[in-house]
Amino acid sequence: NKITMQTYEEHGHLSDTFRYVVADLCHEEYTAFSNRRKRNLYGNKGAFSYYNPGTEYEYSNKIVYVVPNVNGRFLLVQAFRCGEKWHLVDIVYRQTASMEEIKSSIKKHEASLYIVECSNVYFPMVRELRCSLPEVKVAKEYPDVDKRIAATSDFIKEYFLLSEKKLEDSDEYGSFLASLLDYNIDSENKEANITLSGLAYYIIKYCS
């Protein structure tokens, strides 16, 4: 502007207008999303802490917790114990019903104990895994997952640490966390919470 001597982006007005249009169109969706997160068990800012994967840690226990099928998704959480905390080292969160893919993924994740929460349909798979893995246990499917999720949420916030690097590098790790944060008692998307609460329930009961 020759009068004010201010400079402007060439298409600044258009981009500003576009932002206003997007904000107006997406306002209701964002409000619903925001309110859903606020009501979530983990909705508070800073609910989760992180560990530094670049640091060498001495782990006293290594667990892989598996739920082979929740709403058509296969979930796996690899958690290593460091002192009183548990590092969520890796996560599998994918849409698959392939038994071979599930078995292969489980075998690729190191642990001293593998826990499979499943119905009896998956017992043959568990028996097969026992032939090649150190220790494989079966956990029965929990009848009231919402109660378990609520009962373990404080423990999860206090003792489970996330990997910031994994969040950046792994789409599945990020999708798992998004599912975790989107949970409420009426939602259909409970896969991540079912799996993490199952792991927490086992740790509280047998590893505390």
PLM regions and their residue ranges:
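RNase H-like, metal-dependent nuclease domains and their acidic two-metal-ion catalytic environment used
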Residues: 1-137, 163-208
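Short, surface-exposed amphipathic charged segments that create phosphate/polyanion-binding patches used
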Residues: 1, 147-159, 177-181
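Conserved phosphate-binding/catalytic loops in two-lobed NTP-binding clefts
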Residues: 134-148
